[in-house]
Amino acid sequence: MKRDMYKMFAECLVFTLAIAFLLGFAVACSDSDGKDVAGGSSVDAGVAAITDKNIAGVVQKGPFVKGSNIVLEETSADGSFEPTGKEFFATTRSDKGDFQIDDINLESQFVRLTATGYYKRETTGENTVCQISLRALSDISNRDQININILTHLEYDRALYLVKNGKTFAEAKKQARKEWMEQFGYKNLADDFENLDIANGGKADKALEQISAHFDECMFGEYCGTICAYEINNDCKSVQASIDDLAKIFSTSGKLPSSIDSLKQHRLDDFFKCTYEWMGK
């Protein structure tokens, strides 16, 4: 009798432990699905695959000319935001910078986009002598339009830095937007940069147009009486480096140095003088 009782107790204990293990496993899986963390990055509600998605948009510094190249890169399903090597390609359809990418299938909803081409200058109406590349980082799970512009380019490095340091994607994008707009003197404009279009009349759209025009003058013009980025080395590499370096300097702290003095030794110091002057710094 005692042996039967011990046997029943042992069987009950094994059954209970098995149930506890399964419940613990289920909770762990639930937590992982709720917030996927990999490589130091933080994702809002897990990574979701994308099937048969179509994305349209416009590329604007000024508007990119017809035939400019667009590349959409898939990022890893592990939440690291690293490219997998899978890419989708398009070209702008007109001199308005419009593009469309169809039949997108991805293992993650988070994508990197790069647009490369000449653009119509905001200040002169002429096409640029140099091609430039602008980037954007986006979650396409609930959007079918992504616009690529100078603000998405500047936001890119900062948002990635924040994600890799524990922010969710949504938090990182929101913080990067806020920091950049405050840097430019716009404190109450919180629109997603991918939604902005210089052809539209909203307040944030107009802010993008003004910011883009100022950058055009510092990159190619004679806005502040110093040497523009193109003339520093008389080549196009300096033009691209000017906006890339600005984004990198901003990426870790969420602000630019308070004084141009700290950038005097920078290879593009005249570009920064121009930028700081119209920022009023």
Question: Where on the chain are the PLM-derived regions?
Answer:
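Sec-dependent bacterial lipoprotein signal peptides
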Residues: 1-27
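Feature for extracytoplasmic/surface-facing segments of secreted or surface-associated proteins
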Residues: 29-281
